[in-house]
Amino acid sequence: MTNCLSFRNGRGLALLCALLGTLCETGSGQIRYSVSEELDKGSFVGNIANDLGLEPRELAERGVRIVSRGRTQLFSLNPQSGSLVTAERIDREELCAQIPLCLVKINILVEDKLKIFEVEIEIKDINDNAPNFPTEELEIKIGELTVPGTRFPIKTAFDPDVGINSLQNYKLSPNDYFSLAVNSVSEGAKYPELVLERALDREKKEIHQLVLVASDGGDPVHSGNLHIQVIVLDANDNPPMFTQPEYRVSVWENVPVGTRLLTVNATDPDEGFNAQVSYILDKMPGKIAEIFHLNSVSGEVSILKSLDYEDAMFYEIKIEAQDGPGLLSRAKILVTVLDVNDNAPEITITSLTSSVPEEGTVGREIALIDVHDRDSGQNGQVEVFVLGNLPFKLEKSIDQYYRLVTATSLDREQISEYNISLRASDGGSPPLSTETHITLHVIDINDNPPTFPHLSYSAYIPENNPRGASIFSVTAQDPDSNNNARITYALTEDTLQGAPLSSFVSINSNTGVLYALRSFDYEQFRDLKLLVTASDSGNPPLSSNVSLNLFVLDQNDNAPEILYPALPTDGSTGVELAPRSAEPGYLVTKVVAVDRDSGQNAWLSYRLLKASEPGLFSVGLHTGEVRTARALLDRDALKQSLVVAVQDHGQPPLSATVTLTVAVADRIPDILADLGSLEPSAKPNDSDLTLYLVVAVAAVSCVFLAFVIVLLALRLRRWHKSRLLQASGGGLASTPGSHFVGADGVRAFLQTYSHEVSLTADSRKSHLIFPQPNYADTLISQESCEKSEPLLITQDLLEMKGDSNLLQQAPPNTDWRFSQAQRPGTSGSQNGDDTGTWPNNQFDTEMLQAMILASASEAADGSSTLGGGAGTMGLSARYGPQFTLQHVPDYRQNVYIPGSNATLTNAAGKRDGKAPAGGNGNKKKSGKKEKK
């Protein structure tokens, strides 16, 4: 007996040990905690570090963290204490509704080992909700003939809590006619019913006020009240009855909104108002009323909102049928939602390494990927793979986790960046798939310096620019990446006119945009040479340079300056001499002006603005030569005043004026004597002088009117002949003003003396001068003159058509040419032809301008003449052959000197406006006139 017991005890002990071992092995990979709902954020849940066998400090070192699938994080890890704590306030009713056991599963990832531990946390319910009726008041109509013992169902209260904290009992306020009966069903729900204890008498009491109290079993106890108003009516002793107490229906989750599910039906054997049945949807269980709709008249149940199998797989709908007086009955509808493959797989990058060195080994971990599909069954089976022929592969980890690793060695010289595409497909029909992309950079070293696309750059900026204006932008490229390709720009330090280059321009170190730090002046300097350095941010940094030439463009910001006649300092006006015997075209003087600008801004034209004797003098449009327009008469005043305007061709044009005084006399003593004799004779008889002036004004007006008529007739006649010439095709084309630009950047002369010489023996033939009786104070536009000259030249050509000799260009006057010793340059050592053309280099131009300025100053002082000796270009004697032009600045580029193949001369014939003898035999003698 003892041996048997021992054998039996040993066998039982062995079975017990085996069972305990199995339980320990089963629970070794799962951790479970419990926590109450509505705890504050950071409340303790469990010591996760201890349960994982780790120290708290190892949580951060080994990358221990919580991973979840798209759900809001309810818990977090405390790295200091190694505890699992709440991440926010948890509401069990929102999380699990009325499920008795509320479990939340989370995954703990140990990243260094790529291990995942599953943790289950039970959310315990607390009594934080009171029972609540769907309405605060209920009206029940009962016939007075209703027999005692009749039961009247009452709307139930709803408490979202579970267990003892849920709804436990109902209590009715004390009264003489009604009592409360509570029915319990298998699911544990309690349905209150109002029981009539004694017959009602409407004549005694028509309305009864009752209060129904619903209480839960929590601590403290919560309760809710329903105010019941009983109205006594005539008899209605039959409530509506459903055809079946429970309806079942299945529906696919993707059915459209508005789809009819089924139609419920309830009947009432009463008649009239007592038999009118209406259907009511019980709104207590959460959001059922938002998803389903019950027609109160027909009993048709339809869908109000799209169904989702992943949100809810099953719905229980409670409905009521109520007749007219208020009797009702209950039924329920069970809706099963069927799954369809409407969810594509979800790919979550749990851990990612964005860059790897090119010398990395095979099998290096790049990313940890979680793949999940919310569908069920075959629709939730997922496969994942790498797209394309890339040196990467996926390795299966635990659960639905995969590791992305390198399959071969990487070579940055071939590919510096990989765009890895992952595709996950489920097993549904048709299958759904999802793609995600991972960008992987291969780490490089700084082995490439920045490079510019061009060897050098040229930039242009107009002068008088605002400070801070953007000038130019340079861009360099670096094939490296990250800091090795981050380029900064700088200017190499240098000086310009004694000032540091950084005071003129600056460069944005990030964008390479150059800015002007001051306003540039074309007359001060015309170009800057810069050296831009581009450096990367590698270690060590690499750099390269590029040259930038900055050219300043001229603007018309300088008005013409009058060199001759020079403005006196004592307030007096210089006097020019014109002999009485001067013929038309006699050169009285010449206005010399310069413009500090260049190009078109320095092209000068001359206009006669005002004259004391209109029609007596004319001014060359481009030469500034003041000549007599007609022969001097005895009636002409001894003293003539002229106002000459000099205007450049800039936009807008700038101008300057000078006043000339011309004395009509052969010598200075004569003009002094004549002016002295005129003083006393001007006063004797003012009345006779007034009469003479009136008669003179009338005569001049008549002459002017006749002159205008004759002039119009001549112009019409010439225009008619020019049209005939153009029609026949045998005429010579007019020679317009030149619009070519010279090699030194200055526009070519608009017209030349060679035109006059080649057309006629008379030097003034091609320049018809139209006397103006009245002069405005404004400048005559150049366009009006340019439009009139071709017509006049064409007429002269028509008149000379019969004589072929007149159409040949006269040879240039040799007196206008430079000898080898007189040529501007380094002591006349320059080589060139003997045509006397202007030198083209900038240095010689500046010397000639200074020479003209000095000569004009001497002429204003009376110490020299405009003529000078032969070969002096009409300047002072000290600028003759013995004085070269290499030491003086050149203003020639701003002085307008007409003539393409001739230069200034001292020949009397040319100065007086005489041309070489022509073929008409009317050779005129040159007057030997000199001027002061």
UniProtKB/Swiss-Prot annotation:
Primary location recorded for the protein, binned into one broad class: membrane
UniProt membrane topology term: Single-pass type I membrane protein
Annotated GO CC locations: plasma membrane
Coiled-coil region list: none
GO MF terms held by the record: calcium ion binding
An individual GO BP term: endosome to lysosome transport
Signal peptide extent: 1-29
Superkingdom assignment: Eukaryota
Residues linked to a glycan: 265, 419, 545, 685
Keyword Disulfide bond: no
Cytoplasmic-side positions: 714-932
Localization: Cell membrane
Ribonucleoprotein as UniProt keyword: no
Transmembrane segments: 693-713
Disulphide-bonded residues: none
Keywords associated with the record: Calcium, Cell adhesion, Cell membrane, Glycoprotein, Membrane, Repeat, Signal, Transmembrane, Transmembrane helix
Chain spans, region Disordered: 805-841, 902-932
Described purpose of this protein according to its UniProt entry: Potential calcium-dependent cell-adhesion protein. May be involved in the establishment and maintenance of specific neuronal connections in the brain.
Protein name: Protocadherin gamma-A3
Organism encoding this protein: Homo sapiens (Human)
